[in-house]
């Protein structure tokens, strides 16, 4: 009796499922047969009342197979009706192609990122390789190896950020320049020359005003080989500044003093009719620095330079206040930022 009843229900349900014309109708059919009070659900419950074990197994197997077949049919019909519904909706929802597009907010490249990319590109065209080093450094790499005397003002706590705790029994500082990277590069060198690197990165000094920031970006350059002289340095600096600011830029070198270079120079560019603005520091690597990293100063020589990224960006893009770089104001970035298509390819 149960066998014939379930097969009749199968035929009836199959016919209703295939003839359903909407998702709502299909859902009501599903509930009618498989809901808590559904007709097929009732058949499943009645299997437990069959006393003969073999018959109960046979009927149960048949009912489960029919249930699986009907549920598969419901899912198939559901997909079919869903596609029909979407197609009908697409036909109704016509798009007016004459309407203007919605405005899109396009991200812009920060001036510092743009400047870093451009400076790296210029020096890579001269054969300089990219190097990096830790921002948290010991005094040897930041000061001692760079021929900076124990009483030098740069080592005072009002100029430099020192950690209170010692690391391996050494005082640790937030690096004040990326010159520490040149020390690590020369220490790691195993007689492979030339050493020709640039080291961009963040540096830290205890200063904060319109032209100074406690954290800023610097690029260190280093070239070590036999017979390197001041002429090589001047050519390199001239090449960079003319590529960065334009061929018509006027450049001058002034004598200066840095403990890690001898001779040392500061480089200015002309702004307006009379004004000269310092742009970077440079010089020939001091003999003591080469000796500190086990390079024979009688065999090898070289030059180094340091460029403040914020400084050259302010001059090139006419930005008056360095602190604006870190203000996180969207209006400022929209004004001074760059489209990514402005990046030169490296």
UniProtKB/Swiss-Prot annotation:
Keyword Endoplasmic reticulum: no
Compartment(s): Cytoplasm
Molecular function terms from GO: ATP binding; magnesium ion binding; phenylalanine-tRNA ligase activity; tRNA binding
Domain of life (superkingdom): Bacteria
The UniProt record lists the keyword Secreted: no
Keywords attached to this entry: Aminoacyl-tRNA synthetase, ATP-binding, Cytoplasm, Ligase, Magnesium, Metal-binding, Nucleotide-binding, Protein biosynthesis
S-S bonds: none
Requisite cofactors: Mg(2+)
Gene Ontology biological process terms, A to Z: phenylalanyl-tRNA aminoacylation
Cofactor binding mode and count: Binds 2 magnesium ions per tetramer.
A Pfam family recorded for this sequence: Phe_tRNA-synt_N
PROSITE patterns per UniProt: AA_TRNA_LIGASE_II
Family annotation (InterPro entries): aa-tRNA-synth_II, aa-tRNA-synth_II/BPL/LPL, Phe-tRNA-synth_IIc_asu, Phe-tRNA_ligase_II_N, Phe_tRNA_ligase_alpha1_bac, Phenylalanyl-tRNA_Synthase, tRNA-bd_arm
Alphabetized HAMAP family for the sequence: Phe_tRNA_synth_alpha1
Record-stated family: Belongs to the class-II aminoacyl-tRNA synthetase family. Phe-tRNA synthetase alpha subunit type 1 subfamily.
Subunit structure: Tetramer of two alpha and two beta subunits.
Name of the protein: Phenylalanine--tRNA ligase alpha subunit
Origin organism lineage: Bacteria, Pseudomonadati, Pseudomonadota, Alphaproteobacteria, Rickettsiales
Gene this chain is encoded by: pheS
